[in-house]
Swiss-Prot record:
Subunit description: Homodimer.
Identification of the protein by name: o-succinylbenzoate synthase
SUPFAM superfamilies according to UniProt: Enolase C-terminal domain-like (SSF51604), Enolase N-terminal domain-like (SSF54826)
Active site, renumbered: 164 (proton donor), 263 (proton acceptor)
Binding residue positions for Mg(2+): 189, 214, 239
Record key words, sorted: Isomerase, Lyase, Magnesium, Menaquinone biosynthesis, Metal-binding
Co-factor requirement: a divalent metal cation
Encoding gene per record: menC
EC number: 4.2.1.113, 5.1.1.-
Molecular-function GO term, any one: magnesium ion binding
């Protein structure tokens, strides 16, 4: 497959409500759609998930799109791609920049699935017709507001809830939710807000029957997480410091965690994600699909991944209306008894809603890729 053209669509969707974590707050989803067009006129779509600020990882939206334009697309223009797995190797000499790589690589996967006239889910070996999903709730001002939100999402059908926590917004909030919802599948996500000095507080969370505590310590740390996991009965889950299967191997070798939050964007795309999922299954590590407030294209890629058999725990994927009044794809993803349907149409299985996308588009740039074919 040769790619003739790339289209970079910069859009920004307002969130229904601000989403707050221990490191910052988002009021909108600022992103790019990466559209690749091959010699047969097939369109593949990826979504660039890097945030505006370098507070989740080092990448930002502006740095990632620069890497895509100046480094990744020129590489794509220089060769025939025979299978989507080649993209990971093609980009491998470029250090880091996983989210930039993922946005382009996922567009290639979509294009190949469409060329083969099958869904992306089927192409990567997924078998589920629908997937269980959970919901992630950002930091709230008070316990009362949090309880109202949890009740709202439980009423909508979500069976697993993740609470963002931070110093002074942890034990009291978790305890209140657990008392009000004693049978709810519940977990806490710290986004690296704690350190070893907070051990007694983290140990106190053991009593609330949590599914896991996600990323309590630093984004580069494996050793302190291993120290903590040995002293907690609750699973530790790693997120930010997992960028490749090598990171999972390191975490497993020293006992840093018993669960992995797998995000396509954070690990560089589908090829890397599949390796991680397979490793986790072989080594009895719970793996589940995380989210980054994706719009419809990114959500579709996530659902395809989560439809594989390695994923038994509900992910942070959620329905389209969890974050947005309207999404950029049709059909939108709707919750049905705590589940989302896995698209069966070709590729990612949804199409761009051009009317909605145009409404929220900030700019569009086209780049020709057919000058350097070899």
């Amino acid at each position: 497959m040769y790619f003739q053209k790339a289209r970079l669509i910069h859009a920004e969707l307002p969130l229904l409500a601000p989403f707050k974590t221990s490191y910052g707050e988002l009021k909108s989803k600022d992103f790019y759609i990466i559209e690749l067009i091959n010699e047969e006129g097939i369109h593949g779509y990826g979504e660039l998930e890097a945030f505006p600020l370098p507070d989740y990882t080092e990448e930002t939206l502006s740095s990632a799109i620069l890497i895509i334009k100046e480094q990744l697309l020129p590489l794509l223009a220089q060769r025939k791609i025979r299978k989507p797995e080649e993209i990971q190797e093609l980009f491998s000499w470029i250090q880091g920049n996983e989210m930039a790589k993922a946005a382009v690589e996922l567009a290639v996967w979509d294009a190949f699935a469409k060329m083969e006239k099958r869904s992306l889910a089927k192409m990567i070996g997924a078998t589920k017709e629908s997937i269980k999903v959970g919901v992630s709730i950002g930091l709230q001002q008070n316990v009362e507001t949090l309880l109202q939100l949890v009740n709202q999402y439980v009423d909508q059908g979500y069976e697993r809830v993740k609470l963002k926590i931070a110093p002074n917004k942890d034990i009291q909030f978790v305890e209140a939710v657990r008392k009000s919802f004693p049978k709810l599948s519940l977990m806490a996500d710290a986004n690296s807000a704690y350190n070893r000095e907070d051990f007694l507080l983290l140990k106190e969370l053991d009593q609330y029957d949590l599914e896991m505590i996600e990323q309590p310590f630093g984004t580069k740390d494996f050793v302190d997480h291993a120290w903590l996991q040995k002293q907690l009965k609750t699973r530790i889950c790693l997120d930010e410091n997992i960028r490749s299967v090598k990171d999972v191997e390191q975490a497993h070798s020293i006992g840093s965690c018993r669960a992995i939050n797998l995000k396509l964007a954070r690990v560089g795309g589908m090829s890397s994600a599949l390796k991680i999922a397979e490793y986790c299954a072989l080594n009895e590590i719970l793996v589940w699909c995380g989210g980054m407030l994706e719009a419809g294209v990114g959500r579709a890629h996530n659902i395809a991944l989560a439809a594989r058999n390695e994923f038994v725990f509900p992910g942070d994927i959620s329905a389209s209306n969890r974050f947005f009044a309207e999404d950029i794809v049709t059909p939108a993803f709707e919750l049905n008894q705590g589940r989302l349907k896995v698209p069966t149409n070709e590729g990612i299985g949804v199409t761009l809603d051009l009317k909605v996308l145009k409404k929220y588009t900030k700019s569009t740039e086209e780049i020709l890729l057919n000058k350097g074919w070899s």
